[in-house]
Amino acid sequence: DVYKRQILAREDKDLHADIVIGVPDSSLSAAIGYAEEAGIPFETGLIKNRYVGRTFIQPTQAMRDRSVRLKLSPVSSVVKGKSIVMIDDSIVRGTTSRRIVQLLKDAGATQVHVRIASPVITSPCFYGVDTSTKDQLIGAQMSVEEIRDYIHADTLRFMTEEEMKEATHGVGLCLACFNGEYCTKLFSYQEELDK
């Protein structure tokens, strides 16, 4: 994990920002490591409501939107007037990222540079995460630039699949949601219907 966050910061040598923040809780270690590697101060810029669960797994868009509004609050005294690097672990549907960027800008952030500590999710996960079709995944529908525009980030960068392999040494790593290469044969209803 330490190496992973160093790799993400390594590519941003020309990025000038005032602070680095992480989206609680899953990306805090990546944000701290990014800040150390980039030489940019880490700050707590978002406070999490501990009584709201994972937003991207809510069954409807309306529920996801409501959960995001309840889940995170920006710390205005930390973000106001600052150019921010915001680290998150992934972008699944884009709902959470879009709302967080807007929250930070509404709280006075001058710029929000989003860095994602995983590759673009382009394929469904059939191993326990509620993303059963590609049409639910923003990464399967849009380019990185289109995602950046959609979430209103000033810049956006994802870790590449190669960087993830390098950071984790590829040991026991499932990359199916990033590259569509599943480690088990998947059942196809369509193939059965076509028989």
Positions of PLM-derived features:
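A phosphate-binding catalytic loop at a beta-strand-loop-alpha-helix junction
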Residues: I84-L104
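Short glycine-rich phosphate-binding loop at a beta-alpha junction
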Residues: L15-S26
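Conserved hydrophobic/aromatic pocket- or pore-lining residues that grip, position, or stack substrates
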Residues: L8, V20, Y34, V112
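A structural signal for isolated positions on well-ordered beta-strands in alpha/beta enzyme cores
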Residues: I19, V85, H113-R115
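Short, small-residue-biased leader/transition segments that mark boundaries at the very start
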Residues: V2-Y3
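Active-site diphosphate/adenylate-binding microenvironment
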Residues: D25, G33-A35
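PRPP-dependent phosphoribosyltransferase catalytic core
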Residues: Q102-K195
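Short, glycine/charge-rich flexible loops or terminal/linker lids adjacent to PRPP-binding catalytic cores
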Residues: G39-V85, T95, T122-S132
